[in-house]
């Protein structure tokens, strides 16, 4: 049926009303908000208001950057690469798959003492834990101790979901590629006798991961029975219930395992391996001197052109060593201050000139 055209209907924004009915309209309500009549304030950016902002930013950012940079430089840190691809490296012999297990020793010297608690990290390069399929290759329900997920893992774990017709625990590519080198640190005394450094392996994982996200399957005191019917990941040397003799650090709640399962965002990363606690305020945690690093070499990285390293580091109120943050603050503050000076010169030069318009920014 044809509809008669009515100019008033177009203005009202709707069809004519039916006899006896109310008029329908799409016109917004006549309010300040819907009609965009709210009061507004728009600042006029003049040299007198903008220039102080540039100088204030510069005067704030530069001292902060200097403080962060100096603090970062005061952090003691040493890296020992033990990949072993160089023929002269003590770990070069471990690249052969026939040498199992392989133990190599790297000697190094600390020029300055390490005060306070010392953190030992392992670092990997050219390892892309941020790959989409790799990140998804896990079953969080299984890791949280769910009994049904233990025997029937998620399909996201493929191709590391089942092996030998048994479900893998823990399943997935992340768990299958867990770092498994063993690192031991020794201080070489005056009599050239190695003194072992106590390495604490508990307290390296996030509290929320240890107590919330990761749990062993329910059951009795025998952890092996709780994982009955499952098999170890393909690349693991032992099952998950044999990761540690300490029952509070075994199975899915093993802290080395928990740390590894928190994937890194970049291909070059470090993960906390051990803690070296300070025993006395009278003596440094790691005195200057000669040390040796004993490595049980299990984790091959040369297949993907990767590298491995051990890092010893102290920390400060801002965390670990990170000179970039201080440099960034100094750079932003310097650029802001320099722009303020340039704009101040331009404004001073042309402010009283009658041949040019007033400069507004």
UniProtKB/Swiss-Prot annotation:
CC annotations in GO: apical plasma membrane; endoplasmic reticulum; Golgi apparatus; phospholipid-translocating ATPase complex; photoreceptor inner segment; photoreceptor outer segment; transport vesicle membrane
Positions on the Cytoplasmic side per record topology: 2-49, 347-361
Transmembrane segments: 50-70, 326-346
Region entry Disordered, spans: 1-28
InterPro entries in the cross-refs: CDC50/LEM3_fam
Membrane protein topology class: Multi-pass membrane protein
Chief location category: membrane
Subunit relationships: Component of various P4-ATPase flippase complexes which consists of a catalytic alpha subunit and an accessory beta subunit. Interacts with ATP8A1 to form a flippase complex; this complex forms an intermediate phosphoenzyme. Interacts with ATP8A2 to form a flippase complex. ATP8B1:TMEM30A and ATP8B2:TMEM30A flippase complexes have been shown to form intermediate phosphoenzymes in vitro. Interacts with alpha subunits ATP8A1, ATP8B1, ATP8B2, ATP8B4, ATP10A, ATP10B, ATP10D, ATP11A, ATP11B and ATP11C.
The name this protein goes by in its record: Cell cycle control protein 50A
Origin species: Pongo abelii (Sumatran orangutan)
């Amino acid at each position: 049926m044809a509809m008669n055209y009515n100019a008033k209907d177009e203005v009202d924004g709707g069809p004519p009303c039916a006899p006896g009915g109310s008029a329908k309209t799409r016109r917004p309500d006549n309010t300040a908000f819907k009609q965009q009549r709210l009061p507004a304030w728009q600042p006029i950016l003049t040299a007198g208001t903008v220039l102080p902002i540039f100088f204030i930013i510069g005067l704030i950012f530069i001292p902060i950057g200097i403080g962060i940079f100096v603090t970062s430089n005061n952090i003691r840190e040493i890296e020992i690469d033990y990949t072993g691809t160089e023929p002269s490296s003590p770990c070069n012999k471990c690249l052969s798959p026939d040498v199992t297990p392989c133990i190599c020793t790297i000697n190094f010297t600390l020029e300055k003492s390490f005060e306070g608690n010392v953190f030992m990290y392992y670092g990997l390069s050219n390892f892309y834990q941020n790959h989409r399929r790799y990140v998804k290759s896990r079953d969080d329900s299984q890791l949280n101790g769910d009994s049904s997920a233990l025997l029937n893992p998620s399909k996201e774990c493929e191709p590391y979901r089942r092996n030998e017709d048994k479900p893998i625990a823990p399943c997935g590519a992340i768990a299958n590629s867990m770092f498994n080198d063993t690192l031991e640190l020794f201080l070489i005394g005056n009599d050239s006798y190695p003194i072992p450094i106590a390495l604490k392996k508990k307290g390296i994982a996030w509290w929320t991961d240890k107590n919330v996200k990761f749990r062993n399957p329910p059951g009795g005191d025998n952890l092996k029975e709780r994982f009955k019917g499952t098999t170890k990941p393909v690349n693991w040397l032992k099952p998950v219930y044999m990761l540690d003799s300490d029952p509070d650090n075994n199975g899915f709640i093993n802290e080395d395992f928990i740390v590894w399962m928190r994937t890194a965002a970049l291909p070059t990363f470090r993960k906390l391996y051990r803690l070296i606690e300070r025993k006395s305020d009278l003596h440094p945690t790691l005195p200057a001197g000669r040390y040796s690093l004993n490595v049980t070499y299990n984790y091959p990285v040369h297949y993907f052109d990767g590298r491995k390293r051990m890092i010893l580091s102290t920390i400060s109120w801002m965390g670990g060593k990170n000179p970039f943050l201080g440099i960034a603050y100094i750079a932003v503050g310097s650029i802001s201050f320099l722009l303020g000076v340039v704009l101040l010169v331009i404004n001073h030069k042309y402010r009283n000139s009658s041949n040019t318009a007033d400069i507004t920014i």
